[in-house]
Amino acid sequence: MCFHPGASWLKQNGMSPSKKESVEIYCAKEYYRDREYWGPGGVLLHELSHAYHWKVLKDGYDNREIKDCYDAAMKEGLYDLVYVHDDGKNKQKKAKRRAYACENQMEYFAELSVAFLAGTDKNVDYNKWQPFNRNELQTFDPRAYRLLQQIWE
């Protein structure tokens, strides 16, 4: 599953530019498997958060507030070693790895948006990677929590 922000990458990779600014589910079987690692709707919410970041927020992927928040979290090493659901339905937190949110500010925003938006039950893990829910996000990365409050509420 992927959000396609622009036509140029699609053209370069032999895909139809008509897919630009859309979320594409490449393979339903893969989506069905991947969704087990998130809470209800989490994987789709992740991709829709990319679309919101690109299309709605000021300066899109170059949004200064998100970039600054991401840079601060990376400098502090907040996401260098976090729990991840790596076993699907059982949702066991037995693995610790560098978070996918470390990839770039786009993944940081999408990953944390899932934790923030998916639900407010502090006993449910909505995200694949730590922080798993809004309550955990508030204590794990309070700066990001405040930013997401401004963006989403």
Summary of predicted features, one role per range:
Residues 1-75:
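Acidic/His-rich structured neighborhood in mature extracellular/periplasmic domains
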Residues 4, 9-12, 19, 26, ...:
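Metalloprotease/metallohydrolase-associated module, dominated by Zn2+-dependent proteases
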